[in-house]
Amino acid sequence: GGGRPLMPGLIDMHVHPATFGPLQTLSRDMLHPYAHGALAVDRAHGMLLNGFTTVRDLGGPANYLRKIIDAGVVPGPRIYPTENWITTTSGHGDFRELNDPHPNIAGGRQHFYEDYVTIIADGRDEHLRAAREAFGRGRTNQTVVS
């Protein structure tokens, strides 16, 4: 190839470029944001070096990674971010611990869930609201896990 591309870039349709470790531990043991960012940048660069020029993120804080790649700050593939999953109470994406209050009930907290991984939504209206808010924040696709 003489240092030139041999084929068009690959597309990976299911990646988590900015999520590390078992998801059940992230709400309690998240990496420091600087370390987390450095690992995400390294992972994105590795994807690009492996020939993936476009990836579809299916959950995790990849929108921030996408922004710095798009701005030319770091090398990486084109990212189509999902960011938050939409899940139901006690569904596959509900990572609350036993004593954590429900985030949609008075006194509950959104903290980790709304910012990084999961939006808990029950019923049609809550799912529509969650999807509209996610797309309004720059998501390009949405993952629903029940």
Per-region residue spans from a language model:
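Active-site-proximal beta-strand/loop segments in catalytic clefts of secreted hydrolases
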Residues: G1, N50, L58-G59, T82-E83, ...
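Short hydrophobic "helix-edge" motifs at membrane interfaces and signal-peptide entry regions
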Residues: G3-R4, L128
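Metal-associated gating/positioning segment near the N- to mid-region
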Residues: R4-A71, S90-R96
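Metal-coordinating catalytic core of metallo-dependent amide/deamination hydrolases
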Residues: V73-S146
